[in-house]
Amino acid sequence: MNTLPQRSSDYLPLSVLDLVPILSGKTTADAFRNSLDLARTAESLGFKRYWLAEHHNMAGIASSATSVLIGHIAGGTSTIRVGSGGVMLPNHAPLVIAEQFGTLANLYPDRIDLGLGRAPGTDQLTAMALRRHLNAGVDDFPQNVQELRRYFLEENRHSKVRAVQAEGMNIPVWLLGSSSYSAQLAAILGLPFAFASHFAPNMLFSSLKLYRDAFQASEVLEKPYSMAVINVVAADTDEEAHYLATSLYQSFLNVIKGTALPMQAPVDNMDNYWNTAEKYAVTQMLTYTFIGSAQTLETKIQAFLNETQVDEIMVASHIYDHQARLRSYEILASLPLRSGMPII
């Protein structure tokens, strides 16, 4: 994988979302090693960003200490942007996040992104364990975003409460969401917006429209900048890709059933694992999941870009075999995807 061709800068930017999956029969340490290997591969292929999610108390996901993992990935790469997709701000004090990301930005200048979400990223009991009180939560999200952003300002050095490491640092802040709430807030604040269409497809188009229509230019952006997150399982043949995708189906099936399991190996027939209602629920969640060979994917993903008009796509690939996962991103990077042409 050392001589992979770089993706052309003429094409639409592609980025990676990594949940750091723990594989059945493997360890958490294996998951961390695989993530660093994937990040290095993505960098060599010309991907723009490598973001890590925040999830807690989930048997198949190791991305809980997001800031720590960002440092691990940034330290093992040299050019790719590394960030959070995202930090679930209700779980944290804004000051602590400012200190963490200010530290990261000093260690890895002009390479750190800060994506912020308002969901807990876990169940209610675990959310309570994280916060320890009910005084702060999703209702405080707009105020907490603004407080966090203030810590990055140079003039905050005159404040009685400071995040010294963060002051004056260039840390792009993104708002992440799966509904119109974050879209509207991102528009009002003039921030870039990423939509979680990889698991919550229903409000993708309405949220993008709201974001663009309500966008107010800021010192950060003159015009809206949107990103959609999708699932991609690419392989050399359509048949192989659909086989590999059964690990993704099993992962989402376990989520809706409340079953705590690591990522499972692919299977020959999913009908042995789900009933009709479960299949419908999973496939609805995975509406924006693209599976197939390079030829199949180019057509389908380009159509998605034409429909959504997003400026960038971020890709999650829930693939059990690590080498197959690397190959999936290699195939994706080879596609000549371009910014969408409006459908008339």
Where does each model-flagged region fall?
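A conserved active-site cap/scaffold subdomain adjacent to cofactor or substrate pockets
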Residues: A183-N202, L208
